[in-house]
Amino acid sequence: MPVPQLLEVIAKVNKIHKDIQNSIQEKLATHSVLDEELGNPAYGPATKKHLVQVSSILGLLQEYNLLQDDTCFVELGAGKGKVSYWLAKTLELLRHSSSSVLLVERASLRHKHDNKLDKTDVSVVRIRADIADLLLPEIDTIAKAKHVVGVTKHLCGDATDLALTCLMNCQSSGKDVTGMVMTFCCLHRCHWNTYVGKHFFEHVGINSVDFDIMCGLVSWAVCGSGQSREKRKNDESGLGENERYTQIGLNRCEKETVGKKCKDLINWGRKIYLQNQGFNCDLCYYVNSNITLENVCIIAMKANKEV
């Protein structure tokens, strides 16, 4: 892309971000249901990092009083079901026999946790569906529940926006979507047509072209320089990496900061969207960055619900 256009978007990002800087606070939670598992010496660093994230998600659900009975907990993009497994164990310990867990995943995966899930006392249902086509109120598990709570762990790119839209459509149908805890991933895979924060971006002067550029700049936050992707583009344009840095006037540390600001703004737009739908929201760092660089989550709770 032309360097002047890139610099123009970076200038917009820096200006807009000033209004939200320091608004994303650290909120590191844990849940006792995973204490023993986290202490298992047989697990390596990768497994423990995953468990730390799950523990924080469950801890936040508890802290925000979202672990209530007669609730269907919907894990969107459930993968192999590891989050849902520990969520079901938590509900079992709380003796929430009227609650249920619904796993939604479009892929057919091997080595799922479903056999373990079947051994819990909590009703667990897995459906294979694309979130874009999902009508939650038509699912029996949802229809029977008094409340609905959404959960995601590292739902990729615009799948998060599709999940938010899905949950808000569920609310519009008359179901009580009490709240959600959603962690983000791969913001470079977001798309303007599905992004829920368009109203916020248009209000602050970001258009669809700017948004696409921002999604590219996000890689600077999670890859440092975004070198592999950028190197291919530089090779095609005849620009070396150092020359590209010279033209935009940013070193690697400054580029990483720009990438993080882009991530913050994309997630902030999602927060504003949920607030406009009647939710109180916190955008926070739910684990340390040494656990994962994708360490931001949104916690949303019905505005009339008490913690």
Residue ranges and their predicted role:
Residues 1-307:
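Class I S-adenosyl-L-methionine
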